Amino acid sequence: MKKVALVSPLRTAVGSFNKTLAPLSASELGATVMTACLQQSKLEPSLIDQIYLGNVLQAGNGQNPARQAALKAGIPIDVPETTINTVCGSGLHAVALAYNSILAEQGNIVLAGGMESMSNAPYLLRNARNGYKLGNGELVDSLVADGLTCPINHYHMGITAENVAEKYGISRLEQDEFAYQSQLKAIEAKNKKLFEEQIVPVMIKTKKETISFTEDEHIRGNTTQEKLSQLKPAFKENGTVTAGNASGINDGAAAVLVVSEDKCKEHALKPLAYIKGYSLVGVDPAYMGMGPVKAISTLLKQQGISIDAIDLFEINEAFASQALAVVKELGVSLDKVNVNGGAIAIGHPVGASGARILTTLVHEMVRRSSRYGIASLCIGTGMGIAMLVENALI
């Protein structure tokens, strides 16, 4: 079987809700990181066969946001683009589809990733098309409706996190401690400049100047266990899930060149990792946070590899309760999981997160000379995705 490489995995820094990245659309963020991938790899845009980009909150963004981003990045008009919406798994699914395309000989060089501007998700007037004859109309927040609500069970993703906490016995204290550790690890990584090689500057024009945005701004350096313990339950009376032990609402983008080994050699590209395989699975929507357990187990069985052989995991921290339950069910040491913090600290721009955690994973594997890593996410509506990668430099 063909070897498929990951070349120049890069991301923007993650922006906080309605903060620094808010003036930019998802496609502008996507264009920024795609341009950087091409510049770093020194690959001619005309050599790209196709593009897959995740984007979840598409209301009002116009047709095919992936193509918009590609054209803004200077990709030739004859290169086709596909926008992927697999909720939180979109960015990683986009990379998986790029991998599939190469194995199916539908291309040899594919640009893939994800982008999201949660700050720019619009409000909707659902019944305005036919007019309001009497009474008040309701504004619907598309961010909540399309990004954070289970359409099967008709409740917030936070309730699925409460369901997991109850079923798997994850206490409020455990969740707050996990969230605190996520912040500490992210702060340490930021201070040690461990994210520098994976982050590309986003240039933002203001009335007075042009700002270069290069640091994750969702990380809270002043978080304490005491502050976390004082937060009220966000989704359920007497619940355990709070704003402090859940992921953020964020903006950002990430992308990577997915390339056949032959083309890497032909164009002198430098792979950082090889994709060994991936899995996409379905689970009960009420416990969607457990998707990574099934996805990772399926992937390991498919690849004939023991979980003990995996050196590092990036398991998206949608909520502390589900991340802890996943780790416990898999029997994985926390020392291997999200070693530089996760979405609770760094943030969760939904359509970009899959590509973001893959980018972070690959760079950390290279830094540590780790052989195998797995990136995995739970997915709203009840799914899970996981990808196994191998260090190309050892």
What are these regions (language model features)?
Residues 11-12, 23-27, 31-32, 40, ...:
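N-terminal extracellular/periplasmic Venus flytrap/periplasmic-binding protein-like
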Residues 26-42, 65-69, 94-97, 157-164, ...:
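Short, well-ordered amphipathic alpha-helical segments that serve as non-catalytic structural scaffolds
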Residues 159-162, 195-198, 206, 276-345:
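Active-site pocket-lining segment
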Residues 86-116, 165-194, 255-262, 327, ...:
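Active-site-proximal alpha-helical scaffold in enzymes
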Residues 1-25, 139, 224-290, 294, ...:
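Condensing-enzyme catalytic core mediating Claisen C-C bond formation in acyl metabolism
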Residues 109-163:
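Flexible glycine-/small-residue-enriched beta->alpha junction loops
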Residues 23-89, 93-110, 114-133, 199-214, ...:
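Conserved beta-ketoacyl condensing-enzyme motif
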Residues 55-109, 152-156, 222-248, 329-356, ...:
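Conserved catalytic cysteine-centered active-site region
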